[in-house]
Amino acid sequence: LFDTNYWGVVHGSRVACAHLRQHGGALINVGSVLSDVAIPIQGTYCATKHAVKGYTDALRLELEAEGAPISVTLIKPSAIDTPYVQHAKNLLPSEPLNPSPVYAPDTVAEAILHCAENPERDLYVGGAGMMLAEASHHLPRVTDKLMESMMIKQQQSGEPKPANRQDSLYAP
């Protein structure tokens, strides 16, 4: 997961910055609201998105310090209706679900386009994610208790896993 979610962003950012240093423009990395608040069952995913946030924030500071003509934005989507849960390694007793509310992929595409034309430091996609991040910042233990009590159930369908489920590669 780190190879794709973190190192993919690092390598892509480096290539993009080499071009953008000469021509100017916007670097837009896609993170997650889970870079601001962790949820149970998704510890490794949350860690990759925390890493993307830290890298993007540091890169922004470095580019600003060198005077590079590059804006750097971190898009922080909430749960998006993609096949992520169908392909992620599943160690749960049932088929996984994205916790609701789940937003359309077009909302992320629109946010990226918006930030390419109107640079912003960070942009949340999905109001629920922004509310969750704010709650976590101002009421961290209350948010922790809420996540503990709700998120494990919300991420499980209750439907049994098919015997032929094709998960991602996994090694203990």
Where are these regions (language model features)?
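SDR active-site lid
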Residues: A65-P160
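Residue(s) in the substrate-gating loop at a strand-loop-helix junction
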Residues: S32
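A short helix-coil junction within the Rossmann-fold of NAD(P)-dependent oxidoreductases
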Residues: V15-G24
